[in-house]
């Protein structure tokens, strides 16, 4: 991963979702711990399973050719199960360079959602040489069991050389191949949705207290959790100036939902003055 200064837990992150203008003063500690763009991009690709594969068209004089594909992550890189009859497969046989665009699904402004474009070269893989390919892919796409053993279907892996990550407005950067290789998906990504729903449905009062006592949003009237990761969580705090983004860091990294619960409880107690 990128070199860090001594004492820096992780690099400063971009502005969380919810800020109306980039000129507004941030109402939280700008040095709060958060995941890197490499980690966020890895997490996004693990969460999703469909994407747009762009190959170089052999038929149309090198024009980019976009195809809808399903994928799974194998050893940190996406694999596809595609037929030799498909146009994108013919393109890859002639030119291995390709890109894969993975987009986050969700409500609201689609441009505020995350997406990442992975660039690299595709390599044809042997089903017989590595049985784990089939296992990993079918775990993600069980319906593919019908055709996974057909002779005209093969696995291809996109070996990522770099990636362009956009996490929404104000969050974007290039992620190098080595940073991609050395990062990991966030361990909370599978449980994040349930944690967020639970906090918003049952513990808004606790989040309001945290905003008032642990950020500059002293006039917070309501708060909604918008994201959570191993390092902390983000909220949209309703203030007199409208919704404002707030990020609060955990004292310790949370590797599962139970650890995240304990960290949130500790923050609530601290905000209330119980500790």
Regions found by a protein language model. Name each.
Residues 1-275:
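Binding-site signature for planar aromatic cofactors or substrates
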